[in-house]
Regions:
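Catalytic cores of nuclease domains that cleave nucleic-acid phosphodiester backbones
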Residues: 1-44
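Short, surface-exposed loop/helix-turn segments at secondary-structure junctions
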Residues: 44-50
């Protein structure tokens, strides 16, 4: 499985929408996505759930659809390499593979989502989207969290 491309954008039209994906890496049979996640330091059950809840599985199905539409019909699987943001990363790394069947099921769900999006794209009306932007700041606890860790380490 020789690598075909790293971080190459693919574009295609599907279900009446213009689509784009940017796999981190892909071969002729598999796409890959590198994730940095605090969930990599937890058990596999938690990580499996997070892969679903965070949309990583859906992203894999989307990438596969794009690669297939761009002349790579044999791309069947999607692999996630999930690494914890804090060391030791070599101990906290998971390599997860989404089966072709899993991606097929998710693709069916995404097809209905895309079809529901077409009227929104055509009219410019997106239900539930606010008209005003909410300005947010970095939480104070996040600003002091690293300082607290440094104080503990220095003691």
């Amino acid at each position: 499985q020789d690598a075909v491309a790293a971080e190459a954008s693919v574009f295609w039209a599907q279900d009446g929408l213009k689509c784009k994906a940017r796999p981190d890496w892909f071969t002729r049979t598999c796409s890959y996505d590198l994730k940095i996640s605090v969930h990599a330091s937890k058990d596999i059950g938690t990580l499996r759930y997070r892969a679903w809840a965070e949309g990583w599985m859906h992203q894999g199905a989307h990438v596969r659809a794009g690669l297939r539409a761009n002349g790579f019909p044999d791309v069947a699987k999607h692999r996630l390499v999930v690494i914890a943001p804090k060391g030791p990363s070599s101990v906290q790394t998971y390599c997860l593979e989404l089966s072709e069947h899993t991606l097929d099921v998710i693709e069916l769900e995404m097809e209905s989502i895309r079809k529901a999006m077409v009227p929104c794209v055509e009219t410019g009306i997106w239900p539930g989207t606010p008209d005003d932007w909410e300005t947010i700041e970095i939480p104070e606890s996040a600003l002091t969290a690293d300082l607290d860790e440094e104080e503990v380490a220095g003691e």
